């Protein structure tokens, strides 16, 4: 115990603001068009394993919810019309949070104290590992008045990870119904946000979380960084503005 106290005193405070830590150089974030004339070769569409790229004439759009940031499209584009950035602030609001009046009411009710119930409905655990980091001393989720709870009956926010499998469909529906209103649902990662990771049609999966329950916050990524998760939570609570 004495050695632990000595180490704590020597290291000092390690907790940082949600956006204070720099992203590593090798981090892969948002993929976006870089501009220029598309040759319509279709190489990027063929390279994308989740069908996140859509082409309309000469314009290319990337479905950020479905994108797993593998970078294959960037590598295959001979004209360099796609670029991969280090941007992780991809969270977007949906559902009831799109209405200003409803969002204001939810912010007043949950803005300073939010209890989260995590539900894995079929993930590879990568998103779950990132969630665990929120409870460590660096990101310290509790400094924002947010904490995880063991029961959906005590929760305000249902945080869903993984593509919804058929075997866990009932678990998702029952957990959602057990969460008291007003309640929010956050889809964490590309699997929960879009449900395309294992194909749009698959005998074992239902799709994304919004195929079964209304989703209010989407946090894309494969997996999303802890900062991306914090950005999504704080954005939903009205504590920060959309980047």
What are these regions (language model features)?
Residues 1-49:
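Ferredoxin-type iron-sulfur electron-transfer modules and their immediate structural context
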Residues 2, 10, 14, 74-156, ...:
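Flanking helices and flexible, charged tails adjoining ferredoxin-like Fe-S electron-transfer domains
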Residues 8, 36, 64-65, 80, ...:
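Fold-independent oxyanion-binding glycine-rich loops
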Residues 33, 39-90:
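Iron-sulfur cluster-binding cysteine motifs and their immediate structural context
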Residues 131, 139, 145-228:
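Cofactor-cradling patches in redox/metallo enzymes
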Residues 194, 233, 243:
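Long C-terminal interaction/binding lobes of large macromolecular proteins
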Residues 237-241:
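Short, hydrophobic alpha-helical segments
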């Amino acid at each position: 115990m004495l050695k632990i106290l000595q180490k704590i005193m020597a290291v000092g405070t390690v907790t940082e603001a949600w956006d204070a830590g720099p992203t590593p150089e090798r981090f892969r974030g948002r993929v976006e068009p870089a501009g220029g004339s598309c040759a319509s070769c279709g190489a990027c569409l063929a390279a994308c394993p989740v069908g996140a790229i859509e082409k309309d004439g000469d314009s290319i759009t990337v479905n950020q919810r479905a994108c797993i940031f593998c970078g294959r499209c960037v590598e295959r584009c001979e004209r360099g019309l796609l670029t991969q950035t280090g941007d992780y602030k991809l969270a977007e609001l949906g559902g009831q949070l799109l209405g200003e009046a409803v969002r204001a009411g939810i912010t007043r009710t949950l803005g300073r104290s939010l209890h989260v119930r995590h539900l894995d409905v079929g993930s590879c655990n990568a998103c779950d590992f990132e969630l665990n980091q929120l409870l460590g001393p660096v990101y310290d989720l509790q400094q924002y008045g947010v904490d995880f709870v063991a029961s959906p009956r005590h929760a305000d926010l249902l945080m869903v990870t993984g593509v919804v499998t058929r075997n866990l469909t009932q678990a998702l529906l029952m957990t959602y119904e057990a969460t008291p209103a007003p309640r929010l649902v956050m889809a964490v990662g590309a699997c929960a946000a879009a449900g395309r990771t294992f194909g749009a049609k698959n005998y074992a999966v239902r799709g994304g979380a919004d195929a079964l329950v209304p989703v209010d916050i989407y946090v894309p990524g494969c997996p999303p960084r802890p900062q991306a998760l914090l950005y999504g939570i704080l954005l939903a609570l009205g504590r920060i503005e959309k980047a």
